[in-house]
Amino acid sequence: MNLRRNISRRRMIEGASAAALVTAAAATVPAAMASPETAASGPGLPKGNWRIDTHAHYSPDVYNDYLKRYGLLGAITGAYGPWSVDRHLAFMDQYRIQASVLSFGDLQVTVGPVDDRRATARAVNDYARDLVQTRGDRFGIFAVTPMPDIEGSVAEVDRALGELDLDGICLLTNYKGTYLGDPSFAPLYEILNDRGAYVYVHPTGPDQNPAPKLCFGPDIPAGNNVFEYTFDATRAMTSLIYNGVLRDYPNIRWHFTHSGGALPFLAYRLATRHSAFPPFNEVLPEGPLKYIKRLYFDDAQAFTAAQLQPLSSLVPADHIMFGSDWPATRHLYAADNVETMPFLKGSLPILKAGDPEPTVDEIYSRRQRIALERDNALDQFPKLKARIRRAGSR
């Protein structure tokens, strides 16, 4: 596999539909934990930092050293430059984000000898523990594993969710073409199920060499993130459903990105296949929709009515959360985003207003929006919620 060719640079931003931002004053509430009742009773949103970002990435030095060993640093961080705690906090403050739950995106710790991958996962998760101990009111973290090394991953999950007390685990949609529903992953799912773990799944590209050709022409070096991320997430969710993982391990909470990729559009098409293909009923007689409703999603780069309405019709409202995908989306959140994307004027994040997704107002009430951008996440991350409350009481 040509790693440089297949690792995405995330340089293109997915489209968004036009909308206007509705703004108004709100009662002042503590930044550490704004009250939903106070906010919902008035016409505006809470003041101060109140959002919870469930899709945000980080790249500490210990991880950068790992990437350098395999010549991959530029492929992963080249699109958005070096990451730092201060830089991330500055972005969060600009968009009124109280806390970000950090994770790795594409690649994670999948390259190199197994001993190096295990050691890197341990070192990264130790860094994560230290960051949470010092800034736990601003950051949660999904621990990384040395997948597809099952034995090493089981050990690291046990350590990360126990000794290190991190908020969840991050995985990829496939590992060298093996999707998450594969029976070989059963030992990992057993410990995740026993722990009642929250598992954040970031898409990667399909294991194809050469990579699927896109239709942009030779002068646009777009990677897997434009199309294949959404399609691969759909493959992974389908794999989990039809291989019985969601049925057999009901305590695992699965989180997928980008408003569900192609799944909201394809869900009912998938369900109707049961009438045409008897094997579908033999494998999953109850159908797929009940399991889709169990999944959790963020709306990173997918916060318009065209994207959120289909998802909202498919899953419970409290299963959808805010995600920024920062810093990979730094151009989307920049002050000059209208200049670089004038065709999206009216639907882009508004830096001056500190609003990362103004189009949400098209389909949600303010109370619903506060739930999407904060409360739903706090319900799923009790450790983070407790850390925020402790910080607010100081």
Question: Where are the regions a protein language model picked out?
Answer:
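Glycine-enriched alpha-helix->loop->beta-strand junction motifs that scaffold or abut catalytic
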Residues: L164-D167, D194-A197, N251, K293, ...
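Sec-dependent signal peptide cleavage junction
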Residues: A34-P36
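Hydrophobic faces of well-ordered beta-strands that scaffold small-molecule active sites
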Residues: I52-A56, S100-L102, I141-A143, I169-L171, ...
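Catalytic metal-binding/acid-base residues of hydrolase active sites
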Residues: H57, T204-G205, I241, G260, ...
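Mid-to-C-terminal alpha-helical segments outside catalytic/metal-binding sites
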Residues: N2-P30, S41-W50, T54, V62-A99, ...
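Active-site gating/metal-coordination segments in enzymes
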Residues: Q98, L102-M237
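Active-site gating loops and adjacent loop-to-helix segments of metal-dependent hydrolytic enzymes
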Residues: G48, H57-W83, R118, D207-F231, ...
